[in-house]
A protein has these predicted regions:
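Bacterial N-terminal signal peptides
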Residues: 2-12
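Compositionally biased, proline/threonine/alanine/serine-rich low-complexity intrinsically disordered stretches
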Residues: 11, 15-42, 218-229
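N-terminal leader/pro-regions and domain N-caps
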Residues: 26, 30-71
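Extended, solvent-exposed segments with strong compositional bias
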Residues: 54-67, 128-172, 187-190
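Contiguous beta-strand segments within globular domains
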Residues: 75-105
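Noncatalytic modules at the cell exterior or secretory-pathway interfaces
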Residues: 83-91, 167-187
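Short coil-to-beta strand junction motifs in C2/discoidin
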Residues: 103-115
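Surface-exposed edge beta-strand/loop patches
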Residues: 184-229
Length: 229
């Protein structure tokens, strides 16, 4: 009886090993490398201004007047560098005000300006419009003063007022330049309202012009000519 019990104990582990199921090891999951995100550049734009207002005293910015016109060649020309996909045109749009301390004393200085401008491609296709509206009551409502004038402190009477941050998406098909043109201006005064659409009139001013885009890939290097033997 004792011998039979010992024999059963000796064979029990081997029987257990035969009946135990082994779980196969899982293969490691395959990892795919993500493509790197495209590099986006944000630069100060190169632009040609047909009507310079001047340099700001407080900001040091270049201010350029937006003229009413119909031909894109007569507008503010902004260079668009080589790119892939759409481009964001970013700038700040201001109204123009002729400052008069005398009108402020007389409580006749109030103005409400609404200026509408357009951004066009060079084939005269409208990309988008932008509007800036602001009110002037006192000198504190001026965005900046412009240096180089005959007024007190050497500043010009005309100054930017109001500030609208504008972002316009240019389609990928725009490859060289865009033009900023004025469309119309409404001025509300204490004694009435004036509307201006005549060609060649400055109706607004812009500053801080930037471009945001994905640069075009570098051109492929030319293939080397085979060496003659």
């Amino acid at each position: 009886m004792l011998a039979l019990l010992c024999a059963s104990l000796m064979f029990a582990p081997s029987l257990d090993a035969q009946t135990r199921k082994t779980t196969p090891k899982k293969a490691p999951a395959k990892t795919t490398k993500k493509a790197p995100a495209p590099i986006v550049s944000r630069i100060q734009a190169e632009w040609k201004c047909p009507s310079e207002l001047g340099q700001g005293v407080a900001t040091g910015r270049r201010f350029c007047d937006v003229l009413t016109a119909r031909d894109p060649k007569d507008g503010i020309l902004i260079t668009v560098p080589p790119h892939r996909g759409p481009v964001k045109l970013i700038f700040e749009l201001h109204n123009r005000h002729t400052y008069s301390a005398e009108l402020i004393k007389q409580k006749q200085a109030y103005r409400k300006y609404t200026a509408t401008i357009g951004v066009l491609s060079m084939d005269n296709t409208l990309v988008d419009r932008a509007v800036v509206q602001s009110e002037f009551r006192t000198e504190k409502d001026l965005f900046d003063r412009i240096s180089g004038g005959a007024g007190p402190g050497g500043v010009k009477a005309v100054a930017p007022t109001g500030d609208e941050f504008i972002t316009i998406e240019l389609p990928a098909t725009v490859v060289d330049q865009v033009s900023v043109l004025g469309e119309k201006l409404s001025v509300v005064r204490p004694d009435g309202t004036d509307n201006f659409t005549t060609t060649g009139r400055p109706i607004a001013t812009i500053s801080n012009v930037m471009l945001e885009f994905t640069p075009a890939p570098a051109p492929a290097a030319p293939k080397k000519a085979p060496v003659r033997q």
